[in-house]
């Protein structure tokens, strides 16, 4: 008689199932969003928070405050790929208690515009960024690639007195060959924009730092941990993580 296989997880975590993850305050903010909003006055803000914790909406709250209460003229939301641009579609935030709605005019969500984001066909999108900067409209959404090309074409001075928010910030690196990283370093050195950086994983697989220490020191950091996120779910009792070795065909 063969003994039953015993599986011993490498990591075993139990959770309190507080339900806090899905609870909102009087402004319609979940816990991570409320924590980030408390630091809305920072010129340089780094938000480290897991997927599904509400980073996109947290940025909406912060950007609206910077536009309405901190004197910034425009907000530019920069995402790694076009599909993520949908995370910043219009949101009726006043329905849940906030004092303003999030609105992006259709012509300024460049993630919805046709055409690839390589330099051969992106000229029209770069021109659109220039047109946005000259307009009185508050919010533009574009990809990392479009933003890089626009900065190269227009220069960093064109973005003075604006909020630049970079989603999936770990795509940036301190390597000189990382164009977006070099541009952000130049923005920090000029010190005439506000930057919000958001990521669920503040590290890179190639071991290159995301920011150099002297630049990272300029940022106030908001951290919302995976444990806090999972502990706030109502129905997740425990999580076991392990690894197993097999001998012979895997399907057996």
Regions from the PLM with identified roles:
Residues 4-48:
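Conserved pre-motif I regulatory segment
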Residues 41, 71-72, 134-136, 158-160, ...:
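Short loop/turn elements that form and flank the Walker-type P-loop nucleotide-binding site
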Residues 42-63:
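Walker A/P-loop
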Residues 56-61, 66-67, 71-103, 146:
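Conserved Walker A/P-loop ATP-binding site and its immediately adjacent core
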Residues 82-85, 145-148, 170-171, 200-205, ...:
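Conserved nucleotide-binding/hydrolysis micro-motifs of P-loop NTPases
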Residues 97-149:
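Inter-Walker segment of RecA-like/P-loop motor cores
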Residues 144-146, 155-197, 201:
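SF2 helicase catalytic motif II
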Residues 194, 205-252:
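Interdomain helical connector at the RecA1-RecA2 junction of SF1/SF2 helicase-like NTPases
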